[in-house]
Amino acid sequence: MKKFIVITLCVLVFIGACINSNNSSVAPSDETANTEEVSDSVNTDTNEVSEKTWDFTSDTDDMDDSVNKYYSLRSDNFANFDFPYQGDSYLTITVRYMKKYGYDVLLNIDNGQMVGNEFNGTNYVRVRFDNGKVEKYYYSEPNDGSADCVFIKNASKFIKKCKTAKTIIIEQEFYQEGVHQFKFHVDKSLEMK
């Protein structure tokens, strides 16, 4: 099984090296689609602008009937990685509460692999909240070994900062793509229920 994984990884690295055009970039998302609204109403002064806030979802743990809570925020911009992760790659911050684990902070990339190694001390992201100083937050990898998600180690400090911040910038290195910055802006800071 290890031999198969190593061979597959080598093939992907080879293909990526052959196709690599070094044109990865972070581009703003197109939040304003080119659509035109047609209204029969005479009164058009009711332009409602929705506030950008953290998304909240919950579910019930069937084992102990406890409520799991998830607060998530998707980046305003995205990275456009080369093969095999082509397409818009957004970063998502998720604050998770589960009775059996407590509070966690997860960072998840849509397409791509986060690079960081605990042995070499490179398992961290750089984060800036509002106009504060840049801070390092070390992370752990998930138990399943996936590279698209990491768990922030000092979750309580990170959550405390999210409760007051309206702008967050996260910088992370990605496999064969280098370092990218993702920006998050909300009209309301994290409010936990």
Locate predicted features.
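Alpha-helical transmembrane anchor segments and their immediate juxtamembrane flanks
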Residues: 1-28
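A generic "folded-domain core" signal
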Residues: 22-193
